[in-house]
Amino acid sequence: MAALAPLPPLPAQFKSIQHHLRTAQEHDKRDPVVAYYCRLYAMQTGMKIDSKTPECRKFLSKLMDQLEALKKQLGDNEAITQEIVGCAHLENYALKMFLYADNEDRAGRFHKNMIKSFYTASLLIDVITVFGELTDENVKHRKYARWKATYIHNCLKNGETPQAGPVGIEEDNDVEENEDAGAASLPTQPTQPSSSSTYDPSNMPSGNYTGIQIPPGAHAPANTPAEVPHSTGVASNTIQPTPQTIPAIDPALFNTISQGDIRLTPEDFARAQKYCKYAGSALQYEDVSTAVQNLQKALKLLTTGRE
C-alpha cells in the first residue's frame, strides 16, 4: 500500500484520539481495513470535539485526505463498500486480539505485547461505534480489556505478580471518564511504528470490574493479529498455539419446522445476513469457533423467528 501523506502535529484538543491514530498507523500494512476505520473514528470524533479552530481544521483536513487516499487504494473491498461487512471485520479482529490477550492472561504469561493487545482491543471496540451503538457484550469487553491492561502493567511496573484471569473487584466509574488514558506516551506527530512498538498506559485509571463474563481463554484462536511478544524480563513469553474449541451443534436446529407460521420481518433477515457476514469474516482468520457460533445464530433465527 502506498505511503500516506503525514499528518500535522496533533492539536491538544484531540488528545483522546491519538492512540486510535497510532493504532491506524500500526495497521496500515498489517490490515488496511482496520487502519481505515481507526482513522474514520478519529475523524468523526475530532469533528465533534473541535472543527472550528484553525489548527483543528487543518488537522482534520489532512486526516480527511488520508481517508480518501485509503478509500481509493482499497477500491472495491467489501469491508469498505458495505458497512455490515466492515463491522463484522472489525468486530472479529477486535475479538481475536482480546481472546489472544485473555488466553495469555489465563495462562499466566504476562508481557508487554499481551498488555498492548488488551489495550488495542479496547481501542478497536471504540472504533466499532462508527457503525452504531455497541452491544452490551462489546461494552463489557472494552471495560475489562482496558482495566486488565492497567492492572497488569502496574503489577509488572511494581515488581508484583498479577493474578491470572478475571478477578473479583469493585466497579470504578473513573474508567468511563478517562478512556483517553495513557495518551501522553503517544507523540503529537506519530512516527512510523517499529515491530517492537509498545505503549505506556502509566496514566491509565485503576479500576476493578465484576460481573463481566469473559470467554474462556482456551477459545483463543491459534493465529492472532497480535505481534510476537518481545523480551520483557518476564519469564515464559513463548506463545503456544491453542487448539480451537468448536461449539456443539444444537440438534433442535435441524428439526423441520412443520407449522409453516414462522413470519420473518425485514429486521430478522437483516440480522441473519449480519450473522452470516460475521461468520465469513471469522473464516478469513481461520476462526472456526466464531464462524460456527454465528452460523448457528443465523440458522436459529431463520427457523424459529427468535434469537
From Swiss-Prot:
Residues with the N-acetylalanine modification: A2
Chain intervals for the UniProt region annotation (Disordered): 160-233
Classification via InterPro entries: Vta1-like, Vta1/CALS_N, Vta1/CALS_N_sf, Vta1_C
UniProt region (Interaction with VPS4B), positions on chain: 198-307
UniProt entry tagged with the keyword Acetylation: yes
Any single GO CC term annotated in Swiss-Prot or TrEMBL for this entry: cytosol
Gene3D superfamilies xrefs: Immunoglobulin FC, subunit C, Vacuolar protein sorting-associated protein vta1
Subcellular location field: Cytoplasm; Endosome membrane
Positions of region (Interaction with IST1): 2-186
Alphabetical GO biological process terms: late endosome to vacuole transport via multivesicular body sorting pathway; protein transport
Pfam families found in the cross-reference section: Vta1, Vta1_C
Keywords assigned: Acetylation, Cytoplasm, Endosome, Membrane, Protein transport, Transport
Disulfide topology: none
UniProt family annotation: Belongs to the VTA1 family.
Protein known as: Vacuolar protein sorting-associated protein VTA1 homolog
Taxonomic source organism: Pongo abelii (Sumatran orangutan)
Gene that this sequence comes from: VTA1
